[in-house]
Amino acid sequence: MNIDIANQLRAAKKATTDLNLIQSDTRTIILKTLAANLEKHIENIIQENQKDLSLMLEQDPRYDRLLLNKERILSLANDVRKVADLPNPLGVNLLEKSMPNGLSIKKITVPLGVIAVIYESRPNVTIDIFSLCFKSGNVCILKGGKEAHFTNSYLLLLIKNTLKNFNINTDIVCLLPPERALMTQLLNATGLVDLCIPRGSQNLINFVRDNAKIPVIETGAGIVHTYFDKSGDLGKGKKIINNAKTRRVSVCNALDTLIIHADRLKDLPELVETLSQKNVIIYADQDAYQVLDKNYPKQLLIKAKPQDFGHEFLDYKLAIKTVPNIKAAIDHIQQFSSHHSEAVIAEDESAIDKFLTEVDAAAVYANASTSFTDGGEFGLGAEIGISTQKVHARGPMGLDALTSYKWVIRGTGQIRN
């Protein structure tokens, strides 16, 4: 292991003791101070962010994820305050019982320990991760991408300066160099890192999963479907599809494939009408293509190929699949889904119940945009990631997902026969 990384990781592991001694009220005050410092240094943050943006083409899908402006920084500070005001997740009594032999047994929440997060493009993640880890008593190791190096470095400086003002050990957070070559060393840090959470492309997630010797929670990759049922309301459908696809195309909860019941193909031109105003390219299957051929701009309409389905576009692109019934829609989703977010637009309650019950995803929706799959929107304050697996957490991961538990047993001298 590279000596510099080894030293950082050992210092981080040692700092868990100091972090556990910080009272909950103090953590809250420190986070609110950090939020104020973010607002105070908006211009400096933007200046550093511009250095990163200047090295990337505006047409790059990552550009929007990398961008920090005044509005986004204020929103970020507000998210930190929301996390600060959340109930303390530590020391929560999950179970308590008195045994016949007189033993008192409790099951209480505790921090996971040292959490490493590997992420790409989004510098706001740096603040989100720290605030959630700090509130939940976890040391955090940050491994951002080189494309956000200037922004991440400045945000880390703000965090550490805030901690110094309260005489807090700054080793409770560290930012590793952005070089990808160091990732394998981090993933092999058994005994020093308790959990790794990759946030980014499917390639990044696959690399981490396949090479890690430390526990991993997969997050981020979203191949998202919305099924417009035979009973779907056209007005709701237009709004939901437009929002899910175009609100922010670069996020993991953005719509990738629209599945439509064959009996509603006549409504397809109206369903996607607003998408053309934002130059959304549609990859339509044969039935959908025939309907849209004279009702959607030709330069934006392409005949779908097999590889267009099961693809996370992260761009102004949408695949359309026609199905004869809801079973075929669910089968298509189960084949191509990344188990992130899936939605149905329907008025038939039996169709809604079938979809919500049978579709295997972290978040399933009826008559709402998948854009809501987000820690803040779920009332979690912020999220460290959106887990697409079932153990140890699923969906948006807030404070509770960053805790484990331990058993506390009190006795009066009991021994076991």
From Swiss-Prot:
CDD domains: ALDH_F18-19_ProA-GPR (cd07079). Coiled coil: none annotated. Disulfide bonds: none annotated. GO terms for cellular component: cytoplasm. One of its GO terms (biological process) is L-proline biosynthetic process. The keyword Amino-acid biosynthesis applies. It catalyses: L-glutamate 5-semialdehyde + phosphate + NADP(+) = L-glutamyl 5-phosphate + NADPH + H(+). It is an enzyme of class 1 (oxidoreductase). Keywords: Amino-acid biosynthesis, Cytoplasm, NADP, Oxidoreductase, Proline biosynthesis. GO terms for molecular function: glutamate-5-semialdehyde dehydrogenase activity; NADP binding. Its EC number is 1.2.1.41. Pathway: Amino-acid biosynthesis; L-proline biosynthesis; L-glutamate 5-semialdehyde from L-glutamate: step 2/2. It is found in: Cytoplasm. Belongs to the gamma-glutamyl phosphate reductase family. Catalyzes the NADPH-dependent reduction of L-glutamate 5-phosphate into L-glutamate 5-semialdehyde and phosphate. The product spontaneously undergoes cyclization to form 1-pyrroline-5-carboxylate. This is Gamma-glutamyl phosphate reductase. The gene is proA.
